[in-house]
Amino acid sequence: MADISSSGSGSSSSLVPPSDDRGYLLTEQVNSASEQLDQLSTDALVELFIEEDLRPQQAVFGARRALSDAVDAIAERLQANGRLFYLGAGTSGRLGVLDAAECPPTFCSPPELVQGILAGGAPALLRSSEGLEDLESAAVADLQDRGFCSDDCLVGIAAGGTTPYVRGGLSYAKNLGALSIAMACVPSEQAPLPCAIDIRLLTGPELLTGSTRLKAGTATKMALNILSTGVMVRL
């Protein structure tokens, strides 16, 4: 519901690690195509963004088997009176909330059937809330507040695959016996996540280094469209 509470195809861009400690992650690498982004003409900048935005579709296609497995597994749970939860922080969490909010008007589904949980709650939907994603225990508390149980499904969304809030939620779901699905935009060997189904959308480095609201966000929205629509047409 809209109410919010507290393996794929890679990029061919050359990778240059930035200086921070997350530089090993694919999403945090420097995209050589944008090293002089501020010096491009407007036409060249627009063309570069359009060219780079072809990569999300390639990434989603590369993850098609995991997406198919997730659709079937979620549909089976929902047919047995389970629910679907999206959980994330920042852009990843907002995209989950968006997809959940659009299910009732699109599919006439009850608002409790698909729910989005964003680290930091409603304020984080409108304003970045750094630090709120760093507590694994916060995810557990948010899931417990929704009555999350072993019949349910959790899709933990984290572009870089390292968000403690998402990791904590996935661990809780998996240990509870619920269906646990991870969605990230880095290879599993860079950031393994506890889950039964692992969806990796390898969009590569962003034109703005580390700004995963760009290609990673686009691929995530595409993947969530597939999950929710694929599931709903099977109910």
Positions of predicted regions on the chain:
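Short, basic, glycine/proline-bearing loop/turn elements
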Residues: E52-G62, S128, C153-G156
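Residues at the C-terminal ends
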Residues: Q79-A80, N175
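Glycine-rich phosphate-binding loops that contact phosphosugars or nucleotide phosphates
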Residues: F85-L235
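Cofactor-/ligand-binding subdomain signature composed of acidic, glycine-rich
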Residues: A2-A59
